[in-house]
Amino acid sequence: MDTFLYTSESVNEGHPDKLCDQISDAVLDACLEQDPDSKVACETCSKTNMVMVFGEITTKANVDYEKIVHKTCRDIGFVSDDVGLDADNCKVLVQIEQQSPDIAQGVHGHLTKRPEDIGAGDQGHMFGYATDETPELMPLSHVLATKLGAKLTEVRKNGTCPWLRPDGKTQVTVEYYNDKGAMVPIRVHTVLISTQHDETVTNDEIAADLKEHVIKPIIPAKYLDEKTIFHLNPSGRFVIGGPHGDAGLTGRKIIIDTYGGWGAHGGGAFSGKDPTKVDRSGAYIVRQAAKSIVASGLARRCIVQVSYAIGVPEPLSVFVDSYGTGKIPDREILQIVKETFDFRPGMISINLDLKRGGNGRFLKTAAYGHFGTGKIPDREILKIVKETFDFRPGMISINLDLKRGGNGRFLKTAAYGHFGRDDPDFTWEVVKPLKWEKPQA
């Protein structure tokens, strides 16, 4: 049997880039909670004891940017200079301007357009991916790397491993078999964890705790054997971390946010963007389409692409590839997708409830993945949703409720992934049952 190795990585919520993603999505949540029509393009950067929030925001919301920065940093665990940043005493810089009027009139007509007529906020192409190798319909290498990172945070915050600090990275290499286009995991080849720690713990203690409290609960025993390689803090020392160790910037972990290198990526980041930005809403709707294809039994693995022009509601193209695993021809799957989903941005916002903020909804996506990191029960996967989705940018915002901020809705997306999360705020993870007739044997 011919096999191959494939690797995916993840980073913790205390990684400086993920810190910035979470702040940007916390700002988005705050704007949408008070004003669902907020137009948000929020960037964040950070270095030693300094955070800068900048970008273009047009909103009726009253947003205390400094308060959001301090709270987000504190919640992650950056509470002193020793761990990489002092949330309560760090310097906060704010440089926010309004959205360009040229963009505003072209996309939403200064809020005068109907949802179905709202144009895409920019040009671009987005990809959705799904595979039947895990219950989440996500790649196993990505799922394991992401869950290891989330577990590191859990055992740090609950006191199981008090020597842990917020920053950290994980990486998992899986040995796969290609079953006529479908990916079949055979075993875990290598596990790599590099985690920030205090100055008192020994390398032996780190390795023992990571194996017992992080790896063992996350990686199923069936994937581990005597040949599995473990690299646990291989550099030997990781005391200095967070923004003190490296500068952070929003939007630099786009592969971690999606599929761990599987499928494809159009290049656009998610965090800090309202649903008129198709980098985010377009990627969410094609994930739902791809996931629905696999969950409905149309294919074992597939990728869906959509593309847009700025100011134009209708997508320029929609593409489906089942990697040879489709039960019917790809052209027929594509036709089902076009008949079932509405790719207009305004309708995506409605159908996926993407204008609803608050309660950390988008903040949840900003760490540990936007897709596929929690098993969704069959009753949720198969529940009946609207018969047709609209992919025009303005309608995406309405259909996915992407204008709703507040309560950390978008902040949730900024760490640990935007896809595959078992959370009612992740509306793009609900599978649509697709109607099709199985060919006669």
From Swiss-Prot:
GO molecular function annotation: ATP binding; metal ion binding; methionine adenosyltransferase activity
Enzyme class label: transferase
Record key words, sorted: ATP-binding, Cobalt, Cytoplasm, Magnesium, Metal-binding, Nucleotide-binding, One-carbon metabolism, Potassium, Transferase
GO cellular component labels: cytoplasm
Keyword Cytoplasm: yes
Sequence positions that bind Mg(2+): 9
The reaction(s) this protein catalyses: L-methionine + ATP + H2O = S-adenosyl-L-methionine + phosphate + diphosphate
Listed GO biological process terms: one-carbon metabolic process; S-adenosylmethionine biosynthetic process
EC number, UniProt record: 2.5.1.6
Cell location: Cytoplasm
Residues holding ATP: 15, 167-169, 235-238, 246, 252-253, 269, 273, 277
Presence of the UniProt keyword rRNA processing in the record: no
Main subcellular location of this protein, as a coarse class: cytoplasm
Similarity comment: Belongs to the AdoMet synthase family.
Description of how the protein assembles with itself and partners: Homotetramer.
Descriptive protein name: S-adenosylmethionine synthase 1
